[in-house]
Amino acid sequence: GVEDFAIECSLIKVGASEDMQNCADQGIQILGGMGFSADTPMESAWRDSRIGRIYEGTNEINRMLSIGLLLKKGMKGELELMPAVMKATMVMGSEKIEDIEDGPLAQENHLIENFKQLFLMIAGNATQKYGTNLEEEQQVLQALADILIEIYFSESAFLRTAKNISR
């Protein structure tokens, strides 16, 4: 059902609304020499992007939701998270640049895979350190969510680019 996509929905909501906020902020910076006023197109962009971070649940809540659901699914065995954490701990840093395959986007693919391994290592260390109290460590969870958002967006862009190249 729809619950199967709750993690992805939370990641997309947070990432997209914060990217929109950053774009509006850059627009204000560009138009800053003329002074911020309602006469610029950035006024509505800024307002809309700020409101977007609040609607449909605040970004902070969605960050907690995404990581919380991921860890719960891992603990229940719905996702093979713990075996992936163990594997990540063993293989991280074992490949050399020379070991990367040739081909279009090979380096990008390698980089994204390393991002994933790094996330798994950090999540595993956090789980080991805090155990069941991890849900109380909001700063750790927010940092994990931020990493996960970047991985999700990077891999989505990578997969779309790879699909376009293969056409």
Placement of each model-derived feature along the sequence:
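Alpha-helical interface subdomain recognition
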Residues: 1-167
